[in-house]
Amino acid sequence: MTWILLATGVLAWAWLLVALTVAFVNHGRVRRMVETRRWLPYALFARYRFMGVLGGALAKLHVPSAVRHREIIEAHQAISLADMEQLRDIVVEMDDLPTIKKGKEALGLTTMFGMSTFPVHKRPSPFTHPMQYPPYLIPGVPARPFYEAAEFEWAQVLEREYPSIKKELNQVLSESGAGFKGYMSEANFRHQGWNTFNFFFYGKKFEENCERCPETTRILESLPRFEKDHIMFSSLNPHARIPPHVGPMNGILRGHLGLVVPPGCFIRVGPDERTWEEGKMMVFDDSFEHEVWNHSDFVRIVLFMNFWHPCFADREIPVLERFRAAYERGPLSRVHADNQAAKRAHDLEVRVPQKAQVA
């Protein structure tokens, strides 16, 4: 009995220490002191190391059979101070981009350093919204949940190419959905009923899938301002739901080309709710809180892709690409891409309405 009480006491003190550490690191005054050009690499380095151990432990507790928690810890531990210094140097470059300068002025900021020390999304401006709170909020990007497809030439190209893309999807579905995999979140949690057939994921090209859908791949790679981090056929099973979440950063628009859309499928982005239409593009900003429902008896499938926001000039895109690569294509993202590529069964229910077939 004594050892049980002793163990309980030790665990209680350990959790208290963790809580105090997190509170200290996130205290506004402390974070403003460390999130400067000089100290930011050290602050991020320490945070990643700490969150690696904590995140791995939490993942193991929640889903022990579905989580590669050891890889999460090892990926965080593989992050070096040099990686964080590189990220700092890119942020210095971003500070000088015209679009970002305009956003900083509107928000009363002089630099992007220290932006996470206060809730920027709660400051009224054309570039913020209370329901837009990604981990990286780039100032200067208009805050709009949805956009109209007619605003983008690339969206019109995809709508014209719908028959070719749908034909290749039907071929994949005729093979019992081989190539689809259960989607794993960045925390390595499985979303039941959400399956993806990946073309690109965190910069990793899925060669076999691209070869099976050559026209779809050709069309995507020919488009301007195409962003190769998340490109896939995205399916949602009957009566499944993707809970509210936000993307990692703003400045990138998400496109969905409706391929199989039974009645009863909806998406909420910020305060607004819409549904898809087969052969039509839906464009939205995934840095807003968003969630998806499929209330039907059939699978819902869209072609899912990313494009850089039109507010950025072409000469600004290379700097933004380096920033995205610095934090998304490091050790953590390699683990996430490898997990997505791993041989893992899907739970895709290939139940397609007859009207959705395209010859």
Residue map of PLM features:
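Conserved metal-binding segment of the jelly-roll/cupin
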Residues: T275-E289
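A short hydrophobic beta-strand segment most commonly corresponding to one strand
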Residues: R254-G258, V283, F298-A313
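Short beta-strand His + acidic residue motifs that chelate non-heme Fe in jelly-roll/DSBH
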Residues: I242-H245, C265-I267, F284, H290-S296
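Non-heme Fe(II)/2-oxoglutarate
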Residues: E74, L81, Q86-L220
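Double-stranded beta-helix
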Residues: F304-P353, V358-A359
